[in-house]
Design a protein with these regions (language model features):
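Glycine-rich beta-strand-to-loop/alpha-helix junction loops that act as flexible
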Residues: 1-9, 28
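Conserved phosphate- and dinucleotide-binding cores of soluble alpha/beta proteins
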Residues: 7-16, 20, 33-234
């Protein structure tokens, strides 16, 4: 879980309070931010597949509508009642995203394995709107690239990229793009334009040199092979 995507909950909380919005449920890795929103009456039920902090642990103990669920109930693609398929929107992080909106949270930009992807691909596929949040450039490395090192979540399930330098919306959402351009002052770019902005800071990144030996596979939620993960060349 990316720190930015987790922290966004606090901004969502304030918007919900200002606009009088109430949510039927929130799910995923539960944090203290979501617990606060639940206890304030902003979220009716928390469906918890993983506690991310001690505030969430304490909430499970005392709040009857903070409900522990299994990974099957959370995101099994063969379970018609999976919570991931009932999401209106999801906010996710990324180590890389490319111009086809493919997302990588499996490996770093150097090809080293970061860890498991959790419900990243599941929630992106199930939600009506999948939003990726990330710094465009971090420590002279761009999160936006021509092609991700490893595909974790396919781009056809991703809708929006939000960065500190601007927002890119998948071109299939023409109505959303037009609405935001007409009614807001948000910086809306094509994803190719955002990539050019990133490269103006970082230059053209060097390609990762991979060895021939496959050490792991990135699989989609249905078991489809998305990408081989190769040993980093020495």
């Amino acid at each position: 879980a990316g720190g930015i995507s987790l922290a966004v909950a606090d901004f969502v909380r304030q918007e919900m309070k200002d606009r009088g919005i109430r949510a039927g449920f929130a799910s995923g890795g539960i944090t203290g931010y979501l617990v606060d929103m639940h206890e304030e009456g902003l979220i009716d039920t928390l469906y918890d597949v993983q506690c991310f902090d001690l505030a969430a642990v304490e909430s499970v103990r005392k709040n009857p509508k903070h409900v522990k669920i299994t990974a099957d109930r959370y995101a099994n693609p063969d379970n018609p009642e999976a919570v991931a398929g009932q999401l209106d929107f999801v906010i996710l992080g990324a180590s890389e995203i490319d111009t086809d909106y493919n997302v990588n949270v499996t490996t770093g930009s150097d090809g080293s394995i970061l860890g498991g992807s959790g419900g990243h691909a599941d929630t992106a596929a199930g939600a009506k709107l999948a939003i990726i949040v990330s710094k465009l450039v971090n420590a002279r490395v761009s999160c936006l690239v021509d092609r991700v090192t490893t595909v974790t979540t396919p781009g056809d399930t991703v809708d929006v990229l939000v960065t500190e330098r601007g927002i890119a919306i998948h071109p299939r959402h023409t109505n959303l793009i037009e609405k935001l351009k007409e009614e807001t002052n948000l910086e809306i770019f094509t994803i190719e334009e955002l990539l050019d902005i990133a490269k103006s800071f970082t230059g053209q990144p060097r390609a990762v040199t991979r060895g021939e030996r496959v050490v792991a596979h990135s699989l989609y939620r249905d078991g489809t092979l998305l990408d081989p993960i190769c040993r980093i060349a020495e």
